[in-house]
Design a protein with these regions (language model features):
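A short, exposed loop/beta-hairpin motif centered on an aromatic-Gly-Thr core
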Residues: 41-51
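Short aromatic-glycine-(Arg/Gly/Cys) micro-motifs in beta-strand/loop hairpins
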Residues: 23-43
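Short aromatic-glycine motifs in intrinsically disordered, low-complexity regions
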Residues: 1-12
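A short, charged, amphipathic alpha-helix used as a generic interaction element across diverse proteins
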Residues: 50-66
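Catalytic phosphate/metal-binding cores of nucleic-acid and nucleotide-processing enzymes, i.e., regions
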Residues: 1, 23, 52
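Phosphoinositide-dependent membrane-docking surfaces
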Residues: 13-24
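Intrinsic disorder/low-complexity segments, especially N-terminal tails and targeting/processing regions
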Residues: 8, 20, 36-38, 63
Length: 66
């Protein structure tokens, strides 16, 4: 079910303003992240120690956008 807002990076983001969501990794730090691009190239990010946690959160966000 499509949501109107998602909570990300300690903020509520209107899903209509999200341009794209992507998975990223910082292999030097051993961290996995998610970037959310909000209209006008305003990036938000969350970082995780485990790839599985990042993937789970990514799927939650994608489900909220559908």
């Amino acid at each position: 079910m499509r949501k109107k807002f998602i909570e990300f990076d300690d903020q509520l983001i209107n899903v209509k303003e999200i341009v794209f969501v992507e998975k990223v990794a910082d292999t030097l730090k051993g961290q996995y992240g998610i970037y959310v691009n909000v209209r006008d190239y305003n990036y938000r990010q969350e970082w995780f120690k485990a790839k599985e946690d990042r993937d789970r959160r990514f799927n939650e966000i994608k489900e909220g956008l559908c």
